[in-house]
Amino acid sequence: MTSQLSEDNSESPNLNSDELECKICYNRYNLRQRKPKVLGCCHRVCAKCLYKLVDCGESPQCVIVCPFCRFETRMPEDEVSSLPDDNNILLNLACGGRGKCVGDNPTELLLTPKRLSTIVTPSHTSTNCLVITIMEVQRESSPALNTTPMVEFYRPSNYDPVSIPQNWTVWNCTSLICKTSVRVFVWLLGLLYFSSLPLGIYLLVSKKVTLGVVFVSLVPSSLVILMIYGFCQCMCHEFLDCMSTP
């Protein structure tokens, strides 16, 4: 056990803070979404930035162009996760960025397959063991989840998708005809109102006295009615104001 810990301590490198950052987004590498990936030109980029480069579609298929030197790196399985990781940076991150593993602290244990294979032995009779199974969610499973229907919509038994556009077209035509007819009627009333005075004079000249008087008096009578209505409204407001004040 001691020799195994000394081996892990000797393999952990000393890295400065600049080497633990992605040179595109300047975020620190981690063991989840921002794993340090090594390109064919030995430049290191986090996995999240590589996914963005692939999604942009500027590079050919199955190829990633290095944003620093334009070197083309082929992806073995047409997936960013198939690119090799920088084991030195991963080891430094797993050790807490202190340049050595946590073997100095007996209360902490680095769970790696290599370490577990040395710990779990027939001679190890202690019952205080904790087994943790960690599985990484595959990237290919997300489109499948997105394609599955989450909500089932109610569809009646008499549902006919062909008749819906026809009914909608008839309804639109009916509403359009109603609106047009109302506008035409309003315009005709306005035209009749403003032409009532010359029309009334013409009827009076033509000796049609009754219709002539009606058309001639239409505009003045409407103006008088509006004036009386406005005057009554003002008087009512003044009366209500006087009643409301103590």
UniProtKB/Swiss-Prot annotation:
Topological relation to the membrane, as annotated: Multi-pass membrane protein
Pathway: Protein modification; protein ubiquitination
PROSITE patterns: ZF_RING_1 (PS00518), ZF_RING_2 (PS50089)
Subcellular location: Membrane; Cytoplasm
Keyword Zinc included in the entry's annotation: yes
Coiled coil: none
Main location: membrane
UniProt keyword list: Cytoplasm, Membrane, Metal-binding, Transferase, Transmembrane, Transmembrane helix, Ubl conjugation pathway, Zinc, Zinc-finger
Enzyme Commission number(s) from the entry: 2.3.2.27
Catalytic activity of the protein: S-ubiquitinyl-[E2 ubiquitin-conjugating enzyme]-L-cysteine + [acceptor protein]-L-lysine = [E2 ubiquitin-conjugating enzyme]-L-cysteine + N(6)-ubiquitinyl-[acceptor protein]-L-lysine
RING-type zinc finger locations on the chain: 22-70
Listed GO MF terms: ubiquitin-protein transferase activity; zinc ion binding
GO cellular component, one term: membrane
Membrane-spanning parts: 184-204, 211-231
Alphabetized CDD domains for the sequence: RING-HC_RNF182
Quaternary structure and interacting proteins, as annotated: Interacts with ATP6V0C.
Protein name according to UniProt: E3 ubiquitin-protein ligase RNF182
